Regions:
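Aromatic- and glycine-rich beta-strand/loop motifs that create alpha-glucan
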Residues: 1-22
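Membrane-interface helix-boundary signature
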Residues: 11-15, 36, 188-191
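Lipid-exposed faces of alpha-helical membrane segments in multi-pass integral membrane proteins
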Residues: 20-28, 198-204
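Membrane-proximal extracellular juxtamembrane segment immediately upstream
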Residues: 24, 28, 39, 187-195
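Juxtamembrane non-transmembrane segments of integral membrane proteins
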Residues: 26-103
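Short, flexible helical or helix-coil boundary motifs
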Residues: 63, 67-70, 74, 82-86, ...
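Extracytoplasmic loops/domains of multi-pass membrane proteins
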Residues: 79-141
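Membrane-proximal, non-transmembrane alpha-helical segments
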Residues: 121-209
């Protein structure tokens, strides 16, 4: 019965065309998902593609693990070392790419430090430059305190009721810390294009069913 239905679908020209369009669209979507990942080499040259994704993954795997105080301090120390050797220069695109090439392996951890030690919903790109050793160990604690402070402000009075605020705080308290870091660029890129792929599949499926 199933074989008969499959033959019935492929016997129609519109069905075959729809499947070809779907296959072509999936290939294009996969191509964009792969080329969406950028790797910067030691010369400051940007690369995309499978090799670039693989190289970036290798860089990030060096920092994979539990983000405890020692790991966070190691990121801060490495970033400050990079800043000394490859400082950011306004308007100097090449110099800035060299800087980025040295930071790309732990850039997401750096951003987490910047956000975790700022006020809630705030981001200071240069916060990591002034982080003290005492502050590093209080990053997770500060994330909870900054959320509590924000939820108790006038800004959130019309956004959340008491139950919703309590729920948000509870979820933050339940979060297992220290966090564990690993590369997720592949998943991030795949999820970015997942909606497009699902829409294409449903569109072609609708043609097949209607036929």
């Amino acid at each position: 019965m199933i074989c008969f239905e499959i033959k019935k679908i492929f016997s129609k020209a519109i069905s075959r065309i729809s499947l070809i369009v779907l296959l072509f669209s999936l290939v294009i979507s996969c191509y964009f998902a792969i080329t969406n990942i950028t790797y910067i080499d030691n010369r400051g040259v940007s690369h995309t593609g499978i090799a670039a994704a693989r190289n970036l993954r290798k860089e990030k795997q060096r920092w994979e693990g539990v983000l405890d105080k020692a790991a966070l301090q190691a990121v801060i120390d490495e970033y400050r070392k990079v800043n000394e050797e490859y400082p950011i220069r306004q308007g100097d695109y090449t110099a800035n790419l060299l800087h980025d090439s040295k930071v790309q392996g732990f850039s997401e951890i750096k951003d987490m430090i910047n956000m975790g030690l700022c006020e809630f919903r705030d981001f200071n790109y240069y916060r990591i430059d002034s982080v003290s050793k005492d502050e590093v160990g209080k990053l997770y604690e500060n994330r909870e305190k900054s959320l509590e402070k924000w939820l108790s402000s006038e800004e959130t009075e019309d956004l959340f009721n008491k139950k919703e605020k309590a729920f948000l705080l509870e979820r933050y308290h339940q979060m297992k810390t220290p966090l564990y870091y690993e590369d997720y660029d592949g998943w991030k890129s795949a999820l970015h294009y997942a909606q497009t792929i699902v829409m294409l599949v449903m569109l072609v499926y609708a043609f097949l069913v209607s036929g």
